[in-house]
Amino acid sequence: MTNNTLDKKEAIKSIVHASVESFAVGFQGRHEGELEDPEGTLNMKIHNVFIAVLGPEIQYYTALVRSLDSSLGNMLEKMAINIAKLTYEVKQSVAGPLSLKQTQDVAELLEKYKRREITPPTTEDYQFLRTKPTEQSLVTKRHDSDYYLIDKETGENFLIELKIGGDLDNKKARSEKEALLEQFAILSNTLPDKTKIKVFFATAYNRFGEGKPWRQERVRQFFADDELL
């Protein structure tokens, strides 16, 4: 293991330790400080008539869990960005030219996925978007991106939609893939031809257990297995 690898490993440990410690202290302090505030975070989450009949302890417990889940997700997103910055240039938006034909081609591909005319999806399905448009009717489009990463050493580009929970959203699988493909097309239009661009749909943990395959069929209807992290 090289010194550079060891240094990076220690840096990651330091980021994780600092992030978790800061989160725990801040989470405890914020909720204890707001306990008597009727407009505090927990007190604004307890007004559920169905939970209320179970008693005040259950009311506060469920509110605390909901607040923890939301706050933890925000912390993990920030921590992931800080870790990514050790190796990648990190951006959170993609903007550039997109042709009407590319937009239509993306829509047609998604329809084929929906009707299962193409199954299973593969990363080869959308490589035609690498062809730069020759038409003049280009529009500038901008997408917010969870993580647009550029490898500082290789120049490879990675577009990642990250879900902090263990469940990739079945209902939004199509719209997530559409946004990623449009970003893929924009980068293809603006970067040199041989630039590597990869697309991923990721989650912080696997609801089926780490190392086990995804079984969410709606997600796999639109995403290739090697696009799921």
Region spans (language model):
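Domain-level recognition of nuclease-like catalytic cores that cleave nucleotide substrates
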Residues: D169, K194-L229
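Surface-exposed cleft-lining segments at the edges of enzyme active sites
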Residues: V65-R66, R130-Q136, I164-K171
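Short loop/turn segments at strand-loop or loop-helix junctions that form parts
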Residues: A95-P97, K152, I160-I164, T203-Y205
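Nuclease-adjacent, charged terminal/linker segments that flank catalytic cores
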Residues: M1-S99
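Mg2+/Mn2+-dependent nuclease catalytic core
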Residues: I164-L187
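Conserved catalytic cores of phosphodiester-cleaving nucleases, focusing on short active-site segments
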Residues: A84, S145-L149, E156-G166
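Active-site metal-binding core of divalent-cation-utilizing nuclease and nuclease-like domains
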Residues: G96-E153
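Secondary-structure boundary elements
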Residues: L86-V90, I150-E156, N189-K194
